[in-house]
Amino acid sequence: MLFYFLIWFCLFVFSLLEINNLQKEHSFFLFAISTFLLFFLSFVRWETGTDWDGYYEYFNHIFYYFQDSDFEFGFARINEIIKLTFGNYTILLFVFSCIIFFFQTKVILKYSPLPLFSLFFLWSISFANVFYIRQTVAIALLFYSTTFLVNKKTWLFFICIYIATLFHSTSFVFVFAYFLFRLRITVKQMFFFLLMSFLFSIFLVSVFNSILPLVGGIIQHKLETYLALGEDGGGHESIFSG
């Protein structure tokens, strides 16, 4: 965990410099270096992140195209292409890292007045999506889809949501962002909704903890695993492959 704290501390210092009127070219340089290092870390990591074992096992048991799986179409097809072409899991991590960091960085640079602070914020809440799962790929696409809302390109917004569903089926709920974007929400209301969401998430965790004794077998095991990963920051035990 010391390594992760050092990254947090560096981004924190960079953010303070940026807030205190760091020159734009210097800010961009620090942002570019930080983003590249996080991008590099995202695909050279090994045995880290949520559901690592499940995804790695699935990759190693791909033997032909359009193989039956419980994963979404886009995620499954990319896994098949990489496995049957290269047979290397690190290449798969690299491909997904490119997708995530491309869209994530593009939005930050376009809309954030403080890119370094945005990166620091992302690291604080989600390790800047370094330890991603297929849901993270979908979130990156949804994150980028908001640019089409801003530019009033509605059809591209919905196309982007559809592509995101190819990586995680729950992405379709983001269509409600179209209606929320048209609402006039004050800063106070926004903070109120964020606070309510945070309290609701705490409530859900307590509910899950209460019902765990009532469910058995694999369901209980998976719930306990996800709750434990949420408490320790995602289960990032090691970083680099050997």
Protein language model regions, located:
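Membrane-interface transmembrane helices that cradle and orient dolichyl/undecaprenyl
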Residues: L142-L156
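Transmembrane-helix signature of polytopic, membrane-embedded enzymes
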Residues: E25, T105-W123
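Alpha-helical transmembrane segments and terminal signal-anchor/GPI-anchor hydrophobic tails
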Residues: T48, D53-E57, F66-E72, A76, ...
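Hydrophobic core of alpha-helical transmembrane segments in multi-pass integral membrane proteins
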Residues: L2-I19, I33-F40, C98-F102, L119, ...
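Transmembrane helix irregularities
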Residues: V44, T165-H168
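TM-lumen/periplasm interface segments of multi-pass membrane proteins
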Residues: E18-S97
